[in-house]
Amino acid sequence: QKWNVEVFGQIPCREEEICVLHYIMVSKPWHYNDCRLQEYFWESAQKTSVYAEIRKVLESYTDEERKRDAESCDRLMQTAKDEIAKENNYLNLVKAGKLKSKDRLEVLEKIALYEKEGRFGEDVEEDPPTRELQPSEIDYLRKKLKSRIKTRLTYKVARTFLNKIIENKQLIIKDVIGTEHMDALTSGAVITCNHFNAFDSFAMQIAYEKSKQCKKRRLYRVIREGNYTNFPGFYGMLMRNCYTFPLSSNRDTMKKFLSSMDTVLQHGDFMLVYPEQSMWWNYRKPKPLKKGAYTFAAKNHVPVLPCFITMEDSDILGDDGFYVQEYTIHIAEPIYPDPQKTQAENVDAMRRKNAAVWKQIYEEFYGIPLVYDTAEAVQYVGKPTNIA
């Protein structure tokens, strides 16, 4: 609220925290001499070319006009009170679950349709358009000084943002279970996680920071090409500068991607991969897994660390009319490649073990069997067709 503080009634924050003041109704310095916080307005007004004109407006404003303002203010206050008293006011409808975001409802309908059709690897939301990422545009290993500086600064911004969404209950981590499995790792690893929200990467960051590994191993993240090349604004900055590994439709860029992946894992760092490929908003079931994560691990002789996030409704109602989810992050035992098997055999075996672990966590946490509402029976592990 500090970015839009209305000068009316009780101010919602300390004066020194205010970023933007909004003078409303009978609290306008250009109409009244006794306005609260007017000194900030006049300090700014003095710096403009219309300062003298604003002063004339104040001097010429009549008591009759002020009386009319006060009456208008009283009417607005009464209207607000009448609305609050209504049984079917906006807030009550939202709390009763009768008024939910049209956008979210459409996404849920699309998820139900895609599940029925077995289209688990397809995204249900409009992603940014994908532009081909060129090799010269990406410094995967942050070898350049410019890349390192950008990453360091962006990480600080991201940390502030993460703290804020936790404080505002937009991200709620109820528990992290199994950090000892991450602590026990003695090499690089591919961390897998289900993908259901733009914030689940932040949840995994918190799990990583709760382990002893955060002081000696870096956490990288595989992301889609369009998120790196075309994602706008603040989130685009995070996508490009927070140890991300964007995939690419360019063959030469993918060679660079794979070489850098080998370097990261052999150096002893962690790579977060979403093997389901698609993101389905608040979808609780594990989806069929693609082979990419397990190929990275098997090729570099490092383990896969399966993580699965379960969800429960909190008592916090989001702006979209749905309850904010409380996350429990489950970190399972690492899955190691078998030195007696070929790479292809290890990819298949590790993928199937990961699928079994996620299925077990899902069924034990929710107390129900993993069943899909599909027109035809779907193999949970899925067909290993795509790289990630």
Predicted regions and their residues:
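Catalytic core of membrane glycerolipid acyltransferases/transacylases, capturing the structured
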Residues: D183-R251
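Non-catalytic C-terminal accessory region of glycerolipid acyltransferases
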Residues: L99, V107-K116, K255-A388
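Residue-level preference for the first positions of well-ordered beta-strands
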Residues: V20, G188-V190, G268-Y274
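Soluble, non-transmembrane catalytic domains of enzymes that act on hydrophobic metabolites at membranes
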Residues: V94-T130
